[in-house]
Amino acid sequence: SGITEINPLPSHYVCPKCHWNHFYTDGSVGSGFDLPDHNCPECGTLLYKDGHDIPYSVLFGLDGTNIKGFGLAFVQDAGLDEVYKYMEKLLGREHVLCYGDKLIPGSEKFLKYPDVCKCLNAKDRRWPANSTVRFNYHSIIDDMLSLTMNGNDALTMVHELQNLTGINPQSIPFNDARALSVFCSADALGITPSKLADVIVNGKVTVGTLGLPGYGTPFARGVLEDVQPKNFSELVKVSGFRHGTGVWVNNARDLIKNDTVKIEEVISTREDVMNYLIHHGVESLTSFTVMENVRKGKGIESKRSNHLAELEAAHVPQWFIDSCLKIRYLPPKAPSIFSAMTALRIAWFKVYQPLAYYAAYFTVYAGGAFNATVILNGLASQKQELARIAALKHLTAVDKDNAAMIEVAAEMYLRGMEFLPVSLEKSEATAFKIEDGKLLPPFNCIPALGNAAAGEIVKARNEHLFTSKADLKKRGKVSQSIIDTMEYMGILKGLPGED
C-alpha cells in the first residue's frame, strides 16, 4: 500500500513472480520474518516472507466503525514544514485542526473532521496558533480522526546510516544471524563481557545492544539477558514488555523463568490476548472484549459479563488468565514491530559497518551529552568518569545521558576504533565524520558550544580558513571562554593569537 512496512496479515509466504502463497493462520509462526527461506513450489522463485498477524478489529473494532488515532514517524531533518504542507494537500487545510494548547518541537497532533463540522472553522480555531482547537479531547475524539506526527531519532539514525554507507536499509534481512545475536551477546562485536564489565562498572553488560534504540537501556538489556531472543518475533515481545505496565515484572518474567511457558506464548501486546483466545476457540466478540479490558488494566470481565466462564469452557490455561489480571496497560503490537525492525536494521550496521554505526549514533544522539573532555581522552578517562557517575547517590538526567554516551564510546574503543581530535579545518558543525579510519567529532562536541554557534564557525570557515584566534573569535562569533576551552582541548594548536 505504501502506507506502512508493517504487514498485518498472518505470517505467510508469497511468490513475487507467480503469486503462489501459503498462510499460517494457527498462530504457530510469530512473524513471517522468522520463516526459513524457501523457493516457490510452482516456479522456483525465492519466496517473499511477511505478516505479523494484527487483526483489523484491534484498530477499527469488530464492526469496523471505531475511529482511532494514527501515528506518522519521520526523519528529524525531513522538516516539519514539508510534512505540514503534505498533510494540507492530502486532507485539505479547511478540515484540519491542531489540538492542544502547547506546541512541542518535533511532535504535532491533528484532527481531521468531516464536512458536516465546518462550523468549527469559524468558532473554535485560534489563529495564528496553528489552527489550535481547545475542545475537551474525549468529547470529540470518537467523531474525528486523530493523526500524530513525530520526528523519530531511530529513523533519523537509519537515514544517516544510509547516507554514510550507500546501503539501502530496506535491503537488510530480518533473519541475519549475526545481527540477531547482538540481542543475546556481544560476541559478534568481538567483545567479551569481562572487557565490558571492566569499563562499565555500574552494572553487567552481556548483550551487544548499547546504543540500539529501544534495546540499549539498562532495563531493556536486563530483559534481553533474561529472554535471550532468537528471532524477530521475540524482539517484538521484548519491545512490548518495555512499553507495557504490569506486563514484564511479576508477570511474563516469572512465567519464563519458572518454565511455565516459552516466550512465544506470554502476553506482551494487545494482539497477543485476542489471537491467543481465538486460537483456543473463544468467540471473536468475547476475545475482542477481553482484549479491550485487559489493555486498559480492567481485568477480564465487563459489566454483566461472564467472560471468565467462557475462557474456562474453552480450556484457556490458568496462567494466561492470571497474567491478564496483572496487566495495567498493554501496548499495541504495531509500534513494537516498528521498534524491532528499526533496531535490527541498526544492529546489522553495528556488526557489518561499525564505524558508520558509531558515526550515525553520535551524530543523532550526542547533542549536549557528548563530554568531549572525557571521551576524547580515551578508555582510561572514560572508565574513570563512569566510575564517578556510578558512585553518585542520586543520578540526574544529565548524569544518565552522559553515562549512556560514554558507555557507547567505550564499546567503540574496545572494538579497536578511536576518535580524532576536533579539527578547526575539517570538523562539521553537528555531524561526526569518518576520517582515516577514525571518527572526527563536530564542533558542537566542545563543552558549552551549541549547534547554532557550531554552524557559525563552519559558515565562517567556508568563506576562508581562520588566520588567528582573534579572527576565529570575530568571524566565528565565539566567546573567550570557548576559545579557552578549544585551547585546552588542543584544537587551536599552531594558530597565532593575532593576525
Language model segments and positions:
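Noncatalytic, beta-rich nucleic-acid-contacting surfaces in large DNA/RNA-processing enzymes
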Residues: 1-499
